[in-house]
């Protein structure tokens, strides 16, 4: 499915390399832009999709104007960009501005090791899984600094909640990925996907043998991104808007962009770790070459990855429309007393399944 893309990219890559070190730098910048620009556009349309889907769930229309609602998110972006950035009188202005950048940067940096198809990855790092854990953990520092620099008790309380929540669920997410690493035998994300390849279709995916870890990772991902029903960090009924309460204009838009970029990232990672990434659910059931336009249906390709991502991204919205916000003590209890013990037990079970041959890599 990606052959036509590689036929265009490979000659372009060789052309840039002809300029020496400058060409390498320009090629790297171009690859970064090829990830960053579609991600920003995806966030805009994701916001529109969220509003339309929640509107449908509430039996109302949702956005209807500004290009029939399609460009509503872009209108909101321009509105925020041209609004004045107001600084609290007692805020630490330098850290106040740096904090949203520290939150946004890891959200984009994590995409460097995310594969979209065979050979379609910015950096095919052998320690990609470890790099992802590091990047997804760094975003909380921006939130903590935002709460502290605002010099507001509501912002500081939201920041402290975020720190405790991220630390609690980061452990469970890390343990869940240890199970994936044991099953795949690699920290490379592309190799993790190929470890789920086989002639049995979706029966070869890690979703079935690692189902408890899949649930833990999915729920922990929702908690990590501070989305409903784990949105006590910015609970409107308690602390107004949490760490973002003093932010306005373009700096507020950076927090908004980071949150939705993280939601899309988690949707990609769940699809890669547990649902075979770009692999087809009927791979091995049908064979033959008909046309590049339809061969991906059984041979796999990036459209399958996007379908899976769309499902999990829509699930975020479904959770928001369906579940009430958990109490803070309930969130902590779920993370420490349920998820962490469950993941530890299932890591041992996964090791036994690999040792006994129940899980076989890439068969």
From Swiss-Prot:
Its EC number is 7.1.1.-. It is a multi-pass membrane protein. This is NADH-quinone oxidoreductase subunit H. It catalyses: a quinone + NADH + 5 H(+)(in) = a quinol + NAD(+) + 4 H(+)(out). NDH-1 shuttles electrons from NADH, via FMN and iron-sulfur (Fe-S) centers, to quinones in the respiratory chain. The immediate electron acceptor for the enzyme in this species is believed to be ubiquinone. Couples the redox reaction to proton translocation (for every two electrons transferred, four hydrogen ions are translocated across the cytoplasmic membrane), and thus conserves the redox energy in a proton gradient. This subunit may bind ubiquinone. Its main location: membrane. Belongs to the complex I subunit 1 family. It holds the Pfam family NADHdh. Keywords: Cell inner membrane, Cell membrane, Membrane, NAD, Quinone, Translocase, Transmembrane, Transmembrane helix, Ubiquinone. NDH-1 is composed of 14 different subunits. Subunits NuoA, H, J, K, L, M, N constitute the membrane sector of the complex. The chain crosses the membrane at residues 62-82, 94-114, 127-147, 166-186, 202-222, 239-257, 264-286, 293-313, 339-359. GO terms for cellular component: plasma membrane. GO terms for biological process: aerobic respiration. The gene is nuoH. PROSITE patterns: COMPLEX1_ND1_2 (PS00668). It is found in: Cell inner membrane. One of its GO terms (molecular function) is NADH dehydrogenase activity. InterPro entries: NADH_UbQ_OxRdtase_su1/FPO, NADH_UbQ_OxRdtase_su1_CS.
């Amino acid at each position: 499915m990606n052959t036509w893309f590689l036929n265009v990219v490979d000659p372009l890559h060789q052309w840039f390399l002809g300029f020496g070190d400058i060409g390498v730098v320009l090629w790297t910048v171009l690859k970064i832009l090829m990830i960053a620009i579609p991600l920003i556009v995806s966030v805009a349309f994701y916001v529109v999709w969220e509003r339309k889907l929640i509107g449908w769930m509430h039996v109302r229309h949702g956005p209807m104007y500004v290009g029939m609602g399609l460009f509503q998110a872009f209108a909101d972006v321009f509105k925020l960009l041209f609004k004045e950035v107001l600084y609290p009188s007692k805020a630490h202005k330098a850290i106040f501005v740096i904090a949203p950048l520290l939150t946004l940067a890891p959200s984009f940096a994590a995409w460097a090791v995310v594969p979209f198809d065979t050979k379609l990855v910015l950096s095919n790092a052998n320690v990609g899984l470890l790099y992802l854990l590091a990047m997804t953990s760094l975003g909380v520092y921006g939130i903590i600094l935002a709460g502290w620099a605002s010099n507001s008790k509501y912002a500081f309380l939201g920041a402290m909640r975020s720190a405790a929540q991220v630390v609690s669920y980061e452990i469970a997410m890390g343990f869940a990925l240890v199970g994936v690493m044991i099953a795949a035998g690699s920290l490379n994300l592309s190799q993790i996907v190929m470890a789920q390849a086989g002639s049995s279709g979706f029966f070869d995916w890690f979703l079935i043998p690692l189902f408890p870890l899949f649930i833990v990772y999915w729920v922990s991902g929702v908690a990590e991104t501070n989305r409903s029903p784990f949105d006590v960090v910015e609970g409107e009924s308690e602390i107004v808007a949490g760490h973002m309460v003093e932010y306005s204009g373009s700096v507020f838009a950076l927090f908004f962009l980071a949150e939705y970029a993280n939601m899309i990232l988690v949707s990609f990672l769940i699809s890669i770790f547990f649902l075979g990434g770009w692999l087809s659910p009927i791979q091995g059931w049908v064979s033959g070459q008909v046309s590049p336009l339809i061969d991906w249906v059984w041979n796999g390709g990036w459209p399958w990855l996007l379908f899976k991502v769309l499902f999990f991204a829509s699930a975020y919205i479904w959770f928001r429309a369906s579940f009430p916000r958990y109490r803070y003590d309930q969130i902590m209890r779920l993370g420490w007393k349920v998820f962490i013990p469950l993941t530890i037990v299932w890591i041992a079970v996964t090791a036994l399944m690999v040792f006994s041959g129940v899980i076989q890599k890439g068969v």
